[in-house]
Amino acid sequence: MAEAEKTVRTLTGRVVSDKMDKTITVLIERRVKHPIYGKYVKRSTKLHAHDETNQCHIGDKVTIRETRPVAKTKSWALVDILERAVEV
């Protein structure tokens, strides 16, 4: 029997914390339509992602993918850094 290939979930967001070792916190923002009023409202989710080489910094725009659980709250991994934060 052929196994159906799973699609890997990927998300894009901004790094809001890099204080943990090999872990980043990524803020994912999305727009959803209010069920009654019809106005589009911003909703956000914070996810912990594995950053093996500690290469991300606050403000970077990154892509993460779902992976096996690495820790109690960490089941996403860094795929790519799309845009570096501007350093002052």
From Swiss-Prot:
Similarity section: Belongs to the universal ribosomal protein uS17 family.
Description of how the protein assembles with itself and partners: Part of the 30S ribosomal subunit.
Keyword set includes Transcription: no
GO molecular function: rRNA binding; structural constituent of ribosome
Record's keyword annotation contains Nucleus: no
One GO-annotated biological process of the protein: translation
GO cellular component: a single term: cytosolic small ribosomal subunit
Role of this protein: One of the primary rRNA binding proteins, it binds specifically to the 5'-end of 16S ribosomal RNA.
Assigned keywords, A-Z: Ribonucleoprotein, Ribosomal protein, RNA-binding, rRNA-binding
Record-given protein name: Small ribosomal subunit protein uS17
